[in-house]
Amino acid sequence: MADDKKTNEYTVEMDKLDHGNKNFEAPAPAVRPRGPPAAQLANNPILPVLAYCGSSILMTVMNKYVLSGTDFNLNFFLLCVQSIVCIVAIQTCKSSKLITYRDFNSDEAKKWFPITLLLIGMIYTGSKALQYLSIPVYTIFKNLTIILIAYGEVLWFGGSVTGMTLFSFGLMVLSSIIAAWADIKHAVESSGDATAKVSTLNAGYIWMLINCLCTSSYVLGMRKRIKLTNFKDFDTMFYNNLLSIPVLLVLTFLMEDWSSANIARNFPPADRNGILFAMILSGLSSVFISYTSAWCVRVTSSTTYSMVGALNKLPIALSGLIFFDAPVTFPSVSAIVVGFISGIVYAVAKIKQSAKPKTGVLPMSNPPVSASSQSMRDSLRS
């Protein structure tokens, strides 16, 4: 049928010949139509980059909104709701044939369950740290996890660290010191009970330290365990969220206060709908991050994706200044800038390592990984 159509386009109709001049002109070849606008839009590299950055900011801001309530203490319940929302969302996408992942297998679940426990420790301590710290400080301190992961790779997987990577680590530590100093300085100089504010910050720093340890343990453990399961793309997300739901349900009912008075404090009538909506949206945002990161890698490149992950630190930190009452001072802004530069230097160091021979290069930066694995690593750092 297509061949017939092409033939007809160049057929000369005899009754249209100019018999006087004995000349004739064939109709102009038909212009090949472009792809549909939707396909062109989907392949535009700007759109997936903006979508990835937006979903990262959305997740952080929604979590902070829920946790910033003065009396919110149902962290395990929040994480459970997010896991349930995530499972419902990806299962719906699978049923609609938008994504694919393997069906549940009990043997694979047993192999993956220890990683799920590490994940629960990571997301719980992360929620506690975000509850006590501002988004900019939380984002800056999250960079320290990169250092722990890098040296974990050196110790357990025989990797190495380049000079540029070490320089980026130094900038990360410096930005964290500046951020902590700016926070404590603002707490001491501001009106109100300075001692209570400093105590709150110290609690946040302790939770942040524990979170960095849990996050690095999770990433390193997942790297080793994934060789046994050969999980791809959304497989990891499916098992992580599915296996964490029963554990989180047990923890929330055993360790958290479910009295009517405490529920009223956590979900005041005036803000109840907004809090529940934010909890659901934060669960969906984790799906958005995985999907948009895979989209970003497919449309652009892994190099561009690495740079986007580094540049994404700045808008996430700025979102805390815009949407919440994070102090805007010269030291706090300086900490954000230094942390932003450290992320760029680290991304450039990773790109240069990837361009070199594989001998003696950190495994975390050299071997190809799936888009979901890469996005998970970056989302943990954001």
From Swiss-Prot:
Cytoplasmic face of the membrane: 1-40, 93-110, 152-160, 222-233, 296-303, 349-382
Ranges in a coiled coil: none
Localization of this protein: Golgi apparatus membrane; Cytoplasmic vesicle membrane; Endoplasmic reticulum membrane
Keyword Transport: yes
Compositionally biased intervals (Polar residues): 367-382
UniProt keyword list: Cytoplasmic vesicle, Endoplasmic reticulum, Golgi apparatus, Membrane, Sugar transport, Transmembrane, Transmembrane helix, Transport
Pfam families in the record: UAA
Gene Ontology CC: cytoplasmic vesicle membrane; endoplasmic reticulum membrane; Golgi membrane
Principal location listed in the UniProt entry: Golgi
Listed transmembrane segments: 41-61, 72-92, 111-127, 135-151, 161-182, 201-221, 234-254, 275-295, 304-324, 328-348
Topology versus the membrane: Multi-pass membrane protein
Membrane-side (Lumenal) residue stretches: 62-71, 128-134, 183-200, 255-274, 325-327
Keyword Amino-acid biosynthesis annotated: no
The organism's place on the tree of life at top rank: Eukaryota
One GO-annotated biological process of the protein: transmembrane transport
Quaternary organization: Homooligomer.
Similarity annotation: Belongs to the TPT transporter family. SLC35D subfamily.
Function of the protein: Involved in the import of GDP-mannose from the cytoplasm into the Golgi lumen.
Protein's name in the database: GDP-mannose transporter 1
Organism field: Neosartorya fischeri (strain ATCC 1020 / DSM 3700 / CBS 544.65 / FGSC A1164 / JCM 1740 / NRRL 181 / WB 181) (Aspergillus fischerianus)
